[in-house]
Amino acid sequence: MQNAGSLVVLGSINADHILNLQSFPTPGETVTGNHYQVAFGGKGANQAVAAGRSGANIAFIACTGDDSIGESVRQQLATDNIDISPVSVIKGESTGVALIFVNGEGENVIGIHAGANAALSPALVEAQRERIANASALLMQLESPLESVMAAAKIAHQNKTIVALNPAPARELPDELLALVDIITPNETEAEKLTGIRVENDEYAAKAAQVLHEKGIRTVLITLGSRGVWASVNGEGQRVPGFRVQAVDTIAAGDTFNGALITALLEEKPLPEAIRFAHAAAAIAVTRKGAQPSVPWREEIDAFLDRQR
């Protein structure tokens, strides 16, 4: 592992309430689960943890409530090699919550309550201007207020900080924001929401990537689940396959991929090698239960890759 540029992650923090069950309930149906746990999550926090554990020099801009779960989350993040000084504690607010069902195939459905995450305002972003401006990269998702994502992207763009956006949860985005993004990592659903193109195969992945290139994004990585990633740089695309593993829980697969990917890119790994590194991290994560508890450390990722040679 080589020295890397600094990373700022801006995003959400949640307490995940996870129920494992054989199949998802249909409307009006009650289903008995076989395992329940509360774990720390939130797309921002998951990606920050993935970056911290995989070796990034990282600071995290986020908000928690002034409750006991918020204090516990902050303590845990600090043990994951994350600078938590930009994490704000919002007085009188609760830490964000996610309710998660995981079925027998490891698939999940998630509902969230923003809580303190909604307080991540443009003013709080502005207070971190210098940190963003001096970073090598800024990684964001869409569980934070869009105006704050936009504010951070503008600061980064003005200061030549790489802007990486994982556009999740899926939603339409203004062209003004997309024009500020250097790297975007949608899954198939998110890519369709952004481009209007259903990503059914590599041909349609290439078409969706081209739409995003035309909006000003140089590097488009469309994650395809078990089929890997469609990677396109300025219109030159290829599919980079992932690793075959027995999935137990896919809750943090995408977040682990994103955090590990940006870490590898900041270490100046070539894009295909960085994707392979991120694939390895995600492959380990899906063999474990929970969001942050599933995220691997750097030595685990390196050992996994060594076994693939």
Can you name each region flagged by the protein language model?
Residues 81, 118-123, 163-170:
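Short gly/ser/thr-rich secondary-structure transition/capping motifs
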